[in-house]
Structure formats: C-alpha cells, structure tokens
UniProtKB/Swiss-Prot annotation:
Protein name, entry field: GTPase Obg
Organism: Thermotoga petrophila (strain ATCC BAA-488 / DSM 13995 / JCM 10881 / RKU-1)
Matches recorded under PROSITE patterns: G_OBG (PS51710), GTP1_OBG (PS00905), OBG (PS51883), OCT (PS51881)
Gene transcribed to yield this protein: obg
Role: An essential GTPase which binds GTP, GDP and possibly (p)ppGpp with moderate affinity, with high nucleotide exchange rates and a fairly low GTP hydrolysis rate. Plays a role in control of the cell cycle, stress response, ribosome biogenesis and in those bacteria that undergo differentiation, in morphogenesis control.
HAMAP family named in the record: GTPase_Obg
CDD domains attached to this UniProt entry: Obg (cd01898)
Length: 435
C-alpha cells in the first residue's frame, strides 16, 4: 500500500458533539365525549450518539484535516397523544484500523481501534425529557409541566494512527530500506540515492509459502531525531505495534563509515522515544554487501555480531543476495510470535445508556448579591433542575420552590440579608421576595 505524502496524516484533533434529547410535551387529551381526558404529553426522543469505527478501507486521517467538527442529530420533541419524539440518528465516524483515540484535554486513552470493525462510543446522546403525562397525581390531575431533554456529551479528541505491521524496518536514511521492502514485498516506494527519500511510512505484504506478513518501511532516523533533527522520531509510533524490528545497516563503507556506531545511535534514538521499543525482538540486516569485498565484509559482520549480540543477516537489496534467507527468517519469527499471542475473545458491542442525571433532592445553596436589591440563588445540584425544567411553566416553578424550601431556602435568603421587595433570581426565573 503506497500513500502519497500529501495524503498521509497520522495525527489530528476533532470535536464531537452528541445530540441533545428532545423536550417532553405539555398536552391534554381532547376528544368528543371525553371532557376530562387528562394529560397526554409524550416524551422527547433521545439524542444521537457519536461512535468511532475502525474501517480497513480508510488508510490515513486526511479526511479530518478540513472537517474537524462532528455533531449527531438531536432527538425530536414529544407530541400529544403520548407520542414519543423520534430518537436522533447515531453518527458513525470511520477511522483507519490502528487509530488510538485520546481525550485531547486529559490525554487519557479512550480506545485503541486495532481491529477491523471495532467500535467505541465517544459521546453519548442526551435522554429525552418526560412529557406531562408522567407528572399526573391524584391531587394534580392536570400538570402544566414537562422536562427538557438532557444535553448530549461533547469533547475534543486526539486521533493518532499507529500503522499495523508485523515487521518494522528502521535505520539511517539511505541505507536501502526502501529498496529492501520493494525487493521482498509488493510495495513500490520512491527510491533515490539521497537521504530522506522516504517521507512517510510505506507498507508491503510479504508472501512466504502459505504465510504472509506486513512490513513497514519507517522514514530514516538520524542522531538527534528525538530533538527534532531531520524528520524527527515521530514516525517511530508506527513501530510500536510491530512484532519484530529489522534494523537495516549500510555496511558498504561508502556513505556510512562505522556500522556499529550507526546501530547504537539509532538504538539510542529509539530509547529516547520509548524504552519499550528496545524490548522488541530485533535482527540486524547488513545491506549493500555487493559493494564490499568478502574479506572486509566478514570483519564487519563479526564486529556487528559481537557488539550487538543480535543475529546479523547479510543481504543486497540490489542483487537479491541473501534475500531468501532474510524473508525465511522474518516469516519464521513473525509466525512464531503470532502463535504465542493469546487469542482475543470477540467483544460484543453494547450501546451505553443516554445521558440522564437524577434530580437531586438535597442542595448546598448559596445566595449571591449581584446588585443592590438583586440576588441570585446558586448551587451545583440546582443547575440540574434549572436545565431540566422550563421555569416559565408555573407548575415547574412551584415544584422547584417546594424542594428548595425543604432545603432551607427561606433561611438562606434571610441570612444573606435579602429584604422584602428585593428581586431573587433562580436560573431564568425571577421573583419578588415576600416574607
């Protein structure tokens, strides 16, 4: 799979907003011969959820460069005859397989969409409000009250793509990684005799007998990459998922003088990015052996084996010498590690419940003086009531004031110094204080 530089994006931020719940309805049954039909206001529909879904046909995050805001549909309002409003449509956003989803504010990892079809809910829709049919009692048979729908969740997300490959080719620029991947796989990357020809990771599928595996050509690293020198080390995130690292070294002596030093410089840059990378299985691929004499090659190979304590496989990506042995070794290691990996049990996706906060019955009230003769009643739990009900509805005001009085509202007003005739505001509702 080859991706053009302009189309390769592996980290973006997006904003997601779930749908709000629809409002409940205030309605009364009106039919011939039914003079006292009673309340029949229906409930509002639930707001749509926002999901991210791993889609194998999507290869980069380029689609999110120009569109960063995603909003699900709101639930419809309830209607008379106890008709519930329609639920808002859920919004599914397709991302590449291998996308890590983080909360952009806290940095918390929400999900790793590392398998095709895997789904995660990133914003829950709000539950629809209840219609007045729910508020009828033996003493209140015609309630003029209904609930507003809950607000849907919203958040900023950071999406980070980590390419899924079995083998990662790492090394200095121009050591022949692109030539190597084109020799062993179906990948056809740009190849040229200058550093940083590869600007994005290239993927290739390698077939060996009845087994196939994926190799990633990671853009070249140089000393100081962790400080941003060259292309930096940001592409190393794509090695994190690999089973095996194939460290490509130029042993020709034409462009790189000391293969052993090169090996440890790259290892140090990998360590600075993530010490975890050094724990991965690794083989050393000594490339460009066609450009060096046999006697000199043997000396270099011995130095590499002694210094690295790794298996060193000499190859020439140009002539093909040693390629069969390399592919056989890569396939053997990857096959063995895939067998050792515990089988993942298929997870059944269960849609979570919509946002719904219980109406609190206890309040920590605070009376704040905003101006001479003008006061505001505040409180964390009070916010839920204010958002849930339309206080322009008389019955909603009465119900809230009754609950507040049980929590000592009158005493709080007196303690704050509220005088008769002063204006008190609760949410959008204002009233004149009377003792």
């Amino acid at each position: 799979m080859n991706i053009e530089r302009a189309d390769f994006v592996d980290r973006v931020k997006i904003f997601v907003k779930a749908g709000d719940g629809g409002n409940g309805c205030v309605s009364f049954r009106r039919e011939k011969y039914v003079p006292k039909g009673g309340p029949d206001g229906g409930d509002g529909g639930d707001g749509g959820f926002v999901f991210l879904r791993a889609n194998p046909s999507v290869s980069t995050l380029i689609e999110f460069v120009n569109k960063r805001k995603f909003v699900a549909e709101n639930g419809k309002h309830g209607m008379g005859k106890k008709m519930k409003g329609r639920n808002g449509k859920d919004l599914f956003i397709d991302v590449p397989v291998g996308t890590v989803v983080k909360d952009a504010v806290t940095g918390e990892i929400i999900a790793d969409l590392n398998e095709p079809g895997k789904i995660v809910c990133v914003a829950r829709g709000g539950k629809g409000g209840r219609g007045n049919a729910h508020f009828a009692t033996s003493t209140k048979q015609a309630p003029l009250i209904a609930e507003r729908g809950e607000k849907g969740e919203s958040r900023w997300l950071e999406l980070e793509l980590k390419i899924l490959a079995d083998v990662g080719l790492v090394g200095y620029p121009n050591v022949g990684k692109s030539s190597l991947i084109s020799r062993i796989s179906n990948a056809r990357p740009k190849i040229a005799n200058y550093p940083f020809t590869t600007l994005i990771p290239n993927l290739g599928v390698v077939k060996y007998d009845d087994f196939s595996f994926v190799v990633a050509d990671i853009p070249g690293l140089i000393e100081g990459a962790s400080e941003g020198v060259g292309l930096g080390n940001v592409f190393l995130r794509h090695v994190e998922r690999c089973y095996l690292i194939a460290h490509v070294i130029d042993v020709s002596g034409y462009e790189r003088e000391d293969p052993v030093r090169d090996y440890f410089v790259i290892r140090e840059e990998m360590k600075k990015y993530s010490p975890f990378l050094l724990e991965k299985p690794e083989i050393v691929v000594a490339n460009k052996i066609d450009l060096i004499g046999k006697e000199e090659l043997e000396k270099i190979l011995k130095r590499l084996r002694d210094a690295t304590d790794r298996e060193v496989i000499p190859v020439s990506a140009v002539t093909g010498e040693g390629i069969d042995l390399l592919v056989s070794k890569l396939a053997s290691i990857v096959r063995e590690m895939k067998v050792e990996k515990p089988e993942r049990k298929e997870e059944r996706f269960v849609k979570p419940s919509p946002v719904w906060r219980r109406l609190p019955e206890k309040f920590h009230l605070e009376v704040v003086k905003e101006d001479e003769g003008y006061w505001v009643v505040e409180g964390e739990n009070l916010r839920v009531w204010i958002e849930r009900f339309d206080l322009n509805q008389r019955d909603a005001r009465l119900m809230l004031l009754q609950v507040l009085e049980k929590n000592g509202l009158n005493n709080k007003l007196k303690e704050a110094g509220v005088k008769e005739g002063d204006v008190v505001r609760i949410g959008d509702f204002e009233f004149e204080y009377r003792e």
